[in-house]
Amino acid sequence: LIKDDSLGERVVPIVPDEARTFGMEGMFKQIGIYSSEGQLYEPEDADQVMWYKESETGVMLEEGITEAGSFAAWTALATSYSSHNLTMIPFYVFYSMFGFQRVHDLAWAAGDAQAKGFLIGATSGRTTLNGEGLQHQDGHSHILSSTIPNCKSYDPAFGYELAVIIEHGLKEMYQDKENYFYYLTVTNERYIQPPKPKTKNIDENIIKGCLLYTSDAADECL
């Protein structure tokens, strides 16, 4: 999306301090981490290909260990269409265990302010591979997100589902101007990612939250 000619300049990735855990370090060099004063020090990883590059023209917001501060930045961007007449598309990516469990009141306030954007609860679930063990094993963040009326929550299993949901969210929030924001949980587990089925109404069923993955009558499963 950042590389898209029409949308790219409006997309802002936000992380607290876990960009490498989520495999986002490639963005450091490509788009830079925003700093109002630029790079003032030599980072420890300066000799690596994907080093920690800060820039006055950086796009990514790397806020450090502060979920509240990161969510505040997301809210500012998610409401800029109203407060500054400038539509932005923020993606806040965080450990799902440290999302709604820590900033639920801010998420509720964002809903009241009619925020629009995407929250990505990464390394979610009880079986995903986390770097710090059980304290990161989230299995209940969707219960919390479901209490916010204008937060639409999804737990996709496959990449094509994620793509369909994000495309639908972009259309709903920014084209149709509906007042929702999206919470999506993703994992880092290794399993087969099948191609998108060529079945009728597949996109519609993904958005509804239920699709036919296999059929008992099929000779072979996907």
What are these regions (language model features)?
Residues 1-194, 201-206:
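Thiamine diphosphate
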